[in-house]
């Protein structure tokens, strides 16, 4: 289980990324995770499985409240959580099998009506004899109040744009759990892995009376899919029964869409969000090196692959020893973090050799390396190949310490031009931002001629040693290989001086740190001292 947004606050082996930071949990067993949010990490996060397609349903909100006695920087009356997810009419195993079969082509699954959740099996139509059906979510609010709306991007695949009928004055106050200066917007846009907090001030009773209604549609639409799906929820006011405009709204989608949401999504809030407080943004002269991660889809007779710079990584096949991306044999060795605890610096590639010969990537372990204290510009590039499947957008996510988001644009990345755009602007700290597509794939890259068709730039100040994932957060793309692993720091920094003898139960597959119905796990508590201090 991954604690999305709080990776840097986890105990060793608690990041939840199997084969990177821990052994997988055996069926029928369980594992105690330990996290300790730090002051300054209050915000909107979520948890989800990090295995296969499980995160489409094994996920939920994770809200870190302010330290006792401290108030949020912006006043509001109440808050609501909007957790956006997707429903597929196939099982997880069906989806994974189709993604990994030879010559498979990833397509959008058909949109489903609201009442198709009432099914005896997840891949059949509902029983028409069922009395109850699943209608839109109803979000209750009171008139003339300010609400903090916490929106969490839990979809597997889709980027979602959403608007609120007759409520277009929204103010972003936080992104990915970090407070920002207030930024006005008329709609919200969110992809897998992202979180946005915004303020919504509800209408007064007089305003509701003039409008003649007390319920308003929340309209959500997917983008960049062969079939863009529209979904709805309701913003419903609690109003006195004696008011003439008090009404009952039919819980079926409206025949006519109440809002017209734009198709253009790639410029939403770009170079707009700024941190509420200074965040230590390192300027270009502090950058030590640049790493380019190219997102592309590759086709071989074995199947279709979502790759990073012509390489793939999954929890079942780490492609160690420079094995090609199309090799399908299961190749799951010792998890990298476990190996570092066992063998120390011998389990970490030589930094100088890796950087000088391979741009920071080690072909033997299929990992990237970084030194604590260095500043790295990470440039994600979108390269279509002119084939029908070869072009998509990607929500890139980083575990561990978060990044400064330097913006995005079409074509190839130009560092000089982007630095000009950054003048007078302080980038925010994020953990998930979008690598967009700016043109339909059929118009570029003919005959498998890969060309740059979009970029996203990050600046990472390496301060959190560990074994961390950097990957596309689209679940389908993760299954197809669009993931990377980074070793940040040396062995003593990563292990923090903890001896392997005290962690033996974590270092073996099915060790005694994993419990089951017969026995409780033997847990090494890493934050006991800190928790005692807090309680005092």
UniProtKB/Swiss-Prot annotation:
Induction, per UniProt: Expression is under the control of the terrein cluster-specific transcription factor terR.
Pathway(s) annotated for this protein in UniProt: Secondary metabolite biosynthesis
Residues that bind Cu cation 1: 2
This enzyme's EC code(s): 1.-.-.-
Binding-site residues for Cu cation 2, renumbered to this chain: 4, 48
Domain Plastocyanin-like positions: 1-67, 79-238, 354-488
CDD domains found in the cross-reference section: CuRO_3_AAO_like_2
Biotechnology: Terrein shows anticancer activity on various tumors including cervical carcinoma, ovarian cancer, and head and neck cancer. The secondary metabolite acts as angiogenesis inhibitors through the inhibition of angiogenin secretion. Terrein also has anti-inflammatory activity. It shows an alleviative function of age-related inflammation characterized as an anti-oxidant and might therefore be a useful nutraceutical compound for anti-aging. Terrein may enhance osseointegration by decreasing the level of ROS and has a potentially synergistic effect on osteoblast differentiation.
SUPFAM superfamilies: Cupredoxins
Binding site for Cu cation 3: 50
One Pfam family from the record: Cu-oxidase_2
Stretch list, region Disordered: 1-21
Disulfide bridge partners, by residue number: none
Listed InterPro entries: Cu-oxidase-like_N (IPR011707), Cu-oxidase_2nd (IPR001117), Cu-oxidase_C (IPR011706), Cu-oxidase_fam (IPR045087), Cu_oxidase_CS (IPR033138), Cu_oxidase_Cu_BS (IPR002355), Cupredoxin (IPR008972), MCO_CuRO_3 (IPR035666)
Family to which the UniProt record says this protein belongs: Belongs to the multicopper oxidase family.
Function per UniProt: Multicopper oxidase; part of the gene cluster that mediates the biosynthesis of terrein, a fungal metabolite with ecological, antimicrobial, antiproliferative, and antioxidative activities. The first step in the pathway is performed by the polyketide synthase terA that produces 4-hydroxy-6-methylpyranon (4-HMP), orsellinic acid (OA), and 2,3-dehydro-6-hydroxymellein (2,3-dehydro-6-HM) by condensing acetyl-CoA with two, three, or four malonyl-CoA units, respectively. 4-HMP and OA are not pathway intermediates, but are rather shunt or side products.
Designated name of the protein: Multicopper oxidase terE
Source organism per UniProt: Aspergillus terreus (strain NIH 2624 / FGSC A1156)
């Amino acid at each position: 289980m991954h604690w999305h947004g709080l990776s840097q606050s986890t105990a060793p082996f608690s990041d939840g990324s199997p084969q990177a930071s821990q052994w997988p949990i055996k069926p029928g067993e369980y594992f105690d995770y330990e996290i300790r949010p730090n002051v300054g990490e209050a915000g909107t996060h979520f948890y989800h499985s990090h295995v296969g397609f499980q995160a489409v349903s094994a996920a939920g909100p994770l809200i870190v409240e302010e330290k006792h006695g401290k108030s949020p920087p912006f006043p509001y009356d109440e808050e609501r959580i909007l957790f956006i997810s997707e429903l597929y009419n196939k099982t997880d195993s069906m989806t994974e099998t189709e993604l990994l079969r030879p010559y498979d082509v990833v397509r959008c699954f058909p949109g489903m009506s609201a009442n198709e959740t009432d099914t005896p099996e997840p891949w059949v139509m509902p029983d028409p004899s069922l009395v109850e059906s699943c209608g839109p979510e109803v979000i209750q609010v009171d008139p003339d109040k300010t609400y903090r709306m916490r929106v969490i991007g839990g979809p597997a695949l889709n980027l979602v744009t959403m608007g609120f009928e007759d409520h277009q004055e929204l103010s972003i106050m936080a992104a990915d759990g970090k407070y920002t200066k207030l930024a006005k917007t008329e709609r919200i846009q969110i992809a897998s892995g992202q979180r946005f907090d915004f303020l919504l001030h509800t209408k007064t009773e007089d305003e509701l009376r003039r409008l003649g209604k007390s319920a308003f549609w929340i309209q959500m639409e997917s983008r960049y899919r062969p079939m863009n799906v529209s979904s709805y929820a309701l913003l419903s006011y609690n109003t006195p029964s004696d008011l003439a405009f008090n009404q009952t709204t039919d819980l079926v989608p409206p025949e006519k869409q109440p809002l017209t949401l734009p198709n253009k999504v790639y410029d939403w809030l770009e170079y707009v969000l700024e941190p509420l407080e200074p965040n230590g943004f390192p300027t270009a002269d502090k950058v030590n090196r640049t790493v380019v991660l190219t997102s592309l889809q590759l086709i071989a007779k074995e199947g279709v692959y979502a790759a990073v710079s012509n390489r793939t990584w999954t929890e079942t096949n780490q492609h160690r020893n420079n094995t090609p991306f199309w090799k399908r044999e299961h190749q799951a060795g010792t998890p990298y973090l476990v190996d570092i605890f066992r063998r120390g610096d011998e389990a970490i590639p030589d930094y100088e050799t890796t950087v000088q010969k391979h741009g920071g990537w080690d072909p033997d372990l299929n990992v990237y390396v970084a030194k604590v204290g260095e500043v790295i510009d990470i440039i994600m590039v979108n390269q279509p190949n002119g084939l029908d499947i070869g072009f998509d957008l990607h929500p890139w996510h980083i575990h561990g310490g978060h990044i400064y988001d330097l913006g995005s644009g079409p074509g190839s990345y130009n560092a000089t031009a982007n630095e000009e755009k950054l003048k007078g602007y302080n980038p925010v700290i994020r953990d998930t931002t979008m690598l967009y597509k700016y043109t339909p794939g059929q118009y570029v890259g003919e005959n498998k001629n890969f060309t740059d068709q979009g970029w996203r730039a990050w600046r990472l100040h390496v301060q959190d040693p560990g074994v961390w994932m950097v990957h596309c957060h689209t679940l389908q793309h993760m299954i197809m290989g669009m993931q990377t692993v980074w070793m940040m720091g040396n062995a003593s920094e990563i292990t923090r001086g903890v001896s392997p003898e005290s962690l033996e139960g974590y270092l073996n597959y099915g060790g005694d740190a994993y419990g089951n119905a017969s026995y409780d796990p033997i847990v090494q508590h890493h934050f006991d001292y800190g928790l005692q201090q807090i309680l005092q």
